[in-house]
Amino acid sequence: MPSLKDLKNRIVSVKNTRKITKAMQMVAAANIRRAQESAEAARPYAERMNAVMSSLAGAVGSTDGAPRLLAGTGSDKVHLLVIMTGERGLCGGFNANIAKLAKAKAMELLAQGKTVKILTVGKKGRDALRRDLGQYYIDHIDLSDVKKLSYPVAQKISQNIIDRFEAGEYDVATIFFSVFQSVISQVPTAKQVIPAQFETDAASASAVYDYEPGDQEILTALLPRAVATAIFAALLENNASFNGAQMSAMDNATRNAGDMIDRLTIEYNRSRQAAITKELIEIISGAEAL
């Protein structure tokens, strides 16, 4: 049975931990609003870009002159998995869930006889995947010094991916990230970015556009921007998801710390009461002996 001193030290330790988790919860709560607004503000642009690119891709089709970023290499032998996680932990299952989805995809591709290459964005994903799939890991894009996510950051990542594609390092690129739904709900998602794929809705499919100077020229010019836009949207979704997950995790940790403090306090009081009772019994017994 722990001594009164040990119990008191544990109570102090848990109280200090609760202060830290509460502070982290408040920081995440302050960040989540801005992150959520940024993610939601980027969605209409990404959707409109998708509609325009879908129209252009439909006009050009899969002709011999179609850009390689759209038509691909004609093979799907080598897959590049771009896994985007957080730079920090203490966010529940946020990082682990993205890594889990990426691992499952990697194992599926390997079972099909494909070649897998892994590029990570985010320290936590790098650590987990190098530990489990180190032989397929090729590089890491460091964002630890980035204070605010911006489009140029996404362009840096997309240019890295496009340069590798043009150098013939892979055939298909897929990004892994988490879509923000709410503070308690983030959905790990995989999205193919090269060869580019664009969803077609009925309104876009029925519309007829004239492009100048021409469909193919505009498509070729916009494809790198479309890849960067998809990555930027994924970064913003990931950032909102991270802050939501961290806020939820730290709230749970704060509540658990409070429950533990209550239990330890009850145990401390009972032990103290037992010690006092024992001393009183000893005093009474001594007095009776006299």
Curated annotation (Swiss-Prot):
Keywords: ATP synthesis, CF(1), Hydrogen ion transport, Ion transport, Membrane, Transport. The keyword Membrane applies. Belongs to the ATPase gamma chain family. It comes from Rhodobacter capsulatus. The gene is atpG. Produces ATP from ADP in the presence of a proton gradient across the membrane. The gamma chain is believed to be important in regulating ATPase activity and the flow of protons through the CF(0) complex. This is ATP synthase gamma chain. InterPro entries: ATP_synth_F1_ATPase_gsu (IPR035968), ATP_synth_F1_gsu (IPR000131), ATP_synth_F1_gsu_CS (IPR023632). F-type ATPases have 2 components, CF(1) - the catalytic core - and CF(0) - the membrane proton channel. CF(1) has five subunits: alpha(3), beta(3), gamma(1), delta(1), epsilon(1). CF(0) has four main subunits: a, b, b' and c. One of its GO terms (molecular function) is ATP binding. Its main location: membrane.
